[in-house]
């Protein structure tokens, strides 16, 4: 079992945000030997020449000095570029909508960074994620954070037994409001800092402008399912399934808004439908690849559980059928809207995250089931 806290070295990944600040504070209060480390994964100021990494590191430095723990920075720009950003671009080239946060946790935080922490002699790697780990029936389990609105197990679904045996999530059992209150009570400089949103390497920048720096946009036609041209799109990569905003199509026809329903990569056509309950927006199942399970015990060929197809979505009842290798078919109990290839599908049994995969394609008709 765990050693005495004072003899236990914990490296905590610090982002300059309030969550990792309070996580570090909690570890220090519990008596652990804590080292704060800031990961530099991206080296590029925004279009105004402003580098948020410099400000974030300054916040890490000030918090660590307030708490009284040593702090360092480590550079994973090369690994991040190769493992996360290239994947991000490749998925967009395929007309899909990737989730770089899942890949960052898999390849950077709980791989490259974990290895770095262990080389420093750490017993554990801690982060400010809203998630929990426990040990039951001879295995580690990944459990949802108690703050259901902030739970981040969706992004941590690729963690296995080894990673969980080394992971600590000090604020997983606290809700966000309490985290802010703790930061304020200790006068941490990050107490009132707003939460970061969106994709980390884009930050507050315009997504379209950012992506166009790396992938040439190919404008094309927007059509309805009958083939009628409804407008122009700036590039398929700028659109995701179920999208309503930014299409620039007036409410012609029934007057209802238009939604993205599919992409024809070969002919560079964006297909749209009218009305938020249009049948074509719904799917009945999906095929997933790159499956990963938290448990190392044998998984049944067919089982029922709940799943999320996007972050913060309420759990949906599904039946999972393993189809060999790292693939599966997921059948929905009821039709689901805007399930998007490239995103993660993550499975749950009650509070436990079972694992997940990448949505490869959707099943559009009952006949395909």
UniProtKB/Swiss-Prot annotation:
Site (Interaction with tRNA): 129, 343
GO biological process, one term: tRNA wobble position uridine thiolation
GO cellular component, one term: cytoplasm
Disulfide links within the chain: 104-200
Residues bound to ATP: 13-20, 39, 128
Enzyme class, UniProt record, top EC level: transferase
Name of the protein this chain belongs to: tRNA-specific 2-thiouridylase MnmA
Gene name as annotated: mnmA
């Amino acid at each position: 079992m765990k050693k005495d806290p004072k003899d236990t070295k914990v490296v905590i990944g610090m982002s300059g945000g309030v969550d990792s600040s309070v996580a570090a504070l909690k570890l220090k209060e519990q008596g652990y030997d804590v080292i704060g480390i800031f990961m530099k994964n991206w080296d590029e100021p925004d279009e105004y020449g402003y580098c948020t990494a410099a400000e974030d590191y300054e916040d890490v430095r000030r918090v660590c000095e307030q708490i009284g723990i040593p702090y360092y920075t480590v550079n994973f720009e090369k690994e991040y570029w190769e493992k996360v950003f290239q994947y991000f671009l490749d998925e967009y080239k395929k007309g899909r909508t990737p989730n770089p946060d899942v890949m960052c946790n898999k390849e950077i935080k709980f791989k490259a960074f974990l290895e770095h922490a262990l080389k420093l002699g750490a017993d554990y790697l801690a982060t400010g994620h809203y998630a929990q780990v426990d040990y039951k029936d001879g295995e580690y389990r990944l459990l949802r954070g108690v703050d259901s609105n902030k739970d981040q197990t969706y992004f941590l679904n690729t963690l296995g037994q080894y990673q969980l045996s080394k992971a600590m999530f000090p604020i997983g059992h606290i809700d966000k409001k309490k985290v802010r209150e703790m930061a304020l009570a200790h006068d941490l400089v990050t107490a009132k800092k707003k939460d970061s949103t969106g994709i980390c390497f884009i930050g507050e920048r315009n997504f379209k402008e950012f992506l166009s720096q790396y992938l040439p946009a190919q404008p094309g036609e927007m059509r309805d399912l009958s083939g009628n041209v409804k407008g122009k799109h700036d590039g398929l990569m700028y659109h995701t399934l179920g999208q309503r905003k930014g299409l620039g199509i007036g409410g012609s026809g029934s007057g209802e808004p238009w939604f993205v329903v599919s992409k024809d990569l070969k002919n560079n056509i964006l297909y749209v439908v009218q009305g938020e309950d249009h049948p074509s927006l719904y799917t009945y199942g999906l095929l997933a690849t790159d499956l990963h399970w938290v448990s190392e015990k044998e998984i049944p060929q067919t089982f029922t559980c709940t799943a999320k197809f996007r972050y913060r979505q309420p759990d949906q009842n599904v039946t999972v059928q393993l189809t060999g290798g790292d693939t599966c078919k997921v059948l929905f109990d009821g039709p689901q809207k805007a399930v998007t290839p490239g995103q993660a599908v993550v499975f749950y049994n009650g509070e436990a995250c079972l694992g997940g995969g990448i949505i490869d394609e959707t099943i559009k008709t009952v006949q395909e089931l």
